[in-house]
Curated annotation (Swiss-Prot):
GO terms for biological process: neuropeptide signaling pathway. GO terms for cellular component: extracellular region. This is CalliFMRFamide-9. Belongs to the FARP (FMRFamide related peptide) family. Signal peptide: none annotated. The lineage of its organism: Eukaryota, Metazoa, Ecdysozoa, Arthropoda, Hexapoda.
Amino acid sequence: SVNTKNDFMRF
């Protein structure tokens, strides 16, 4: 995704 931080939070 554009925001890696958000991606990690998702998982």
